[in-house]
């Protein structure tokens, strides 16, 4: 089977309801196209492929800003963003006909991304080329009470960014392997333990374990626990484009190498509990859930906007950084076709900024 999906939108009329001289909504146009193919035979083989294309152009700033005459000039303030992205992805899988619990699969993707933007007098150009492959095999150990998944992965990620006439390049090559074991005790208890080993061309060996537990007190009530670690390379500019609109300088404090931005990878441990209860009241269904999660960073790229009125500083964490989250949610359908959701969330996010642990904005 095949499918072709398209989506387009645009804003072509300038709007300034409060008459402050700046556009209330950016002008722009966007086009998305997705083409999908799927194939499956009766022998257990399945495959899916997709081709995606995106183009997105935006303009913001003062009402009478003309990108042809005023771009990167002091005449009028303007913002322009031009993004193009192309992606090819695929999944291939085989389920053994006589052993449905056994399968092998391959996930592939390739992405080309191009961003040409300007924010007032600052120009930002970014290119990214990425490839990803993940080979997965799953089966059982003895009986279906003991299942496992294992496989190999590969990430190739190339970044080339230029901001304020400074160029930052990095090439990430990350081969990896993983193993995941699942134990299921009837319908009461499930445990999943996993371990990943990745070798980064710059940061070397990375070990990331994880554990998930689930206990069903009743068919309607269950408790989940999760714990694990992870790492990533922060993308300073792509993740903080909202700060480009200011005229402040970007400063990377005490870079430890010439690789990329010169900062260490972010690493964190996270832990969490979830309690879910499903119920019926007056013949109508509902559910209640409560969550508590904590994340502790052993390293983090800190974005400091308060140290100086003329700078935005980036530096490696020196001290504590954590996030605590508690949430309660009630879902109920008092009448047919009427859903009610009540939720409360409490967040406590703190980071060490140049020696002082402060709330993260």
What kind of region is each of these model predictions?
Residues 288-297, 314-361:
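Gram-negative outer-membrane beta-barrel transporters
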Residues 2, 43-47, 97-104, 143-148, ...:
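Repeated loop/turn-to-beta-strand initiation elements of outer-membrane beta-barrel proteins
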Residues 105-117, 216, 224, 261-316, ...:
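Membrane-embedded beta-barrel scaffold of Gram-negative outer-membrane proteins
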Residues 2-18, 28-30, 103-112, 116-118, ...:
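Surface-exposed extracellular loop regions of Gram-negative outer-membrane beta-barrel proteins
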Residues 8-12, 39, 53-57, 96, ...:
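Transmembrane beta-strands of outer-membrane beta-barrel pores
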Residues 10-32, 40-104, 110-128:
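Flexible loop and strand-edge segments within Gram-negative outer membrane beta-barrel domains
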């Amino acid at each position: 089977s095949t499918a072709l999906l398209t989506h387009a939108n645009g804003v072509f009329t300038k709007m300034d309801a409060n008459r402050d001289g700046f556009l209330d909504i950016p002008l722009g146009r966007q086009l998305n196209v997705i083409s999908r193919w799927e194939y499956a035979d009766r022998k257990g083989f399945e495959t899916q492929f997709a081709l995606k294309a995106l183009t997105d152009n935006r303009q913001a700033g003062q009402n009478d800003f003309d990108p042809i005459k005023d771009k990167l000039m002091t005449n009028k303030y303007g913002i322009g963003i031009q993004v193009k992205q192309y992606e090819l992805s695929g999944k291939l899988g085989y389920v053994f006909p006589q052993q449905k619990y056994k399968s092998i699969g391959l996930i592939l993707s390739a992405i080309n991304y191009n961003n040409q933007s300007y924010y007032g007098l600052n120009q930002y150009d970014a290119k990214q080329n990425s490839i990803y492959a993940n080979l997965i095999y799953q089966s059982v150990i003895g009986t279906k009470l003991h299942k496992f998944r294992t496989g190999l992965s590969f990430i190739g990620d190339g970044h080339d960014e230029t901001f304020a006439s400074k160029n930052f390049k990095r090439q990430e090559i990350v081969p990896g392997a993983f193993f995941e074991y699942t134990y299921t005790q009837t319908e009461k208890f499930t445990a999943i333990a996993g371990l990943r080993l990745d070798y980064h061309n710059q940061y070397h060996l990375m070990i990331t374990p994880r554990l998930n537990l689930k206990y069903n007190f009743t068919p309607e009530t269950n408790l989940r626990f999760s714990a694990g670690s992870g790492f990533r390379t922060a993308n300073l500019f792509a993740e903080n484009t909202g700060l480009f609109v200011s005229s402040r300088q970007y400063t990377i404090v005490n870079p430890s190498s010439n690789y990329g931005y010169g900062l260490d990878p972010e690493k964190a441990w996270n832990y969490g509990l979830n309690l879910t209860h499903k119920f019926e009241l007056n013949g109508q269904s509902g559910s209640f859930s409560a969550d508590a999660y904590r994340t502790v960073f052993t390293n983090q790229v800190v974005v400091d906007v308060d140290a100086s009125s003329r700078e935005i500083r980036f530096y490696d964490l020196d001290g504590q950084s954590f996030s605590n989250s508690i949430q309660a949610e009630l879902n109920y359908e008092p009448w047919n076709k009427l859903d009610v959701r009540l939720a409360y969330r409490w967040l406590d996010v703190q980071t060490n900024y140049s020696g002082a642990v402060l709330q993260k904005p």
